[in-house]
């Protein structure tokens, strides 16, 4: 009698897909004039998954350009563009499923707006729109899930903040997300497309510690 652990993919049992991000970013900022400034940067993001999803491990290299504008007595607005390449570092190195290449190219643009609130209940209000276009590199005919697939991921966010005391503030946010997937297979389009609403509250507490 031998004891085995069933490692096969199950259609009924779901597994948590946990991952960690380690983002390293180098940025240069310079002023254009009194109300305009820009930033240029490059980053390296390591996105590694826990078992049994380690075949999705990615090293992501990206470049970023951001232009900011201050509007007198109103607030600020910015435009940001990212261009990145994700390399599937576990491709053909772990389980059988790692024979499928999850590498992709990505382009993302982002427009955040921050305004002074005209309601005394809040200090600032803001909104932003972010859209990512992702193109998978997979060409294997047997990798139906990724081959020839791309998607557009759009996020519309709103937020308000309020400083309660000098060292305590609250931010309440809402985000509406929509992903539209394009594939030659209808079931892939249905599986990887979704709409999502997120609500959250962030409490920020700042303090200083001096030791003489």
Question: What are these model-predicted stretches?
Answer:
Residues 1-212:
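Gram-negative and organellar
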């Amino acid at each position: 009698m031998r004891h085995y652990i069933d490692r096969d993919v199950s259609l009924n049992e779901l597994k948590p897909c946990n991952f960690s991000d380690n983002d390293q970013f180098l940025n240069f900022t310079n002023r254009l004039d009194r109300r305009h400034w820009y930033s240029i940067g490059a980053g390296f993001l390591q996105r590694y998954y826990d078992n049994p999803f380690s075949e999705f491990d990615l090293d992501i290299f990206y470049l970023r350009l951001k232009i900011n504008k201050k509007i007198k007595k109103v607030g600020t607005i910015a435009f940001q563009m990212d261009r990145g390449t994700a390399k599937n570092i576990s491709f053909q190195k772990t389980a059988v499923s790692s024979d499928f290449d999850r590498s992709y190219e990505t382009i993302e643009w982002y427009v955040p707006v921050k305004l002074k609130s005209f309601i005394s209940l809040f200090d600032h209000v803001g909104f932003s729109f972010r859209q990512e276009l992702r193109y998978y590199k997979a060409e294997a005919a047997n990798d139906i899930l990724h081959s020839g697939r791309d998607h557009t991921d759009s996020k519309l966010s709103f937020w308000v903040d309020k400083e309660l005391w000098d060292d305590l503030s609250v931010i309440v946010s809402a985000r509406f997300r929509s992903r539209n997937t394009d594939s030659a297979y209808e079931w892939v389009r249905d599986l990887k497309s979704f709409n999502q609403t997120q609500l959250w509250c962030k409490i920020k507490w700042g303090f200083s510690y001096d030791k003489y």
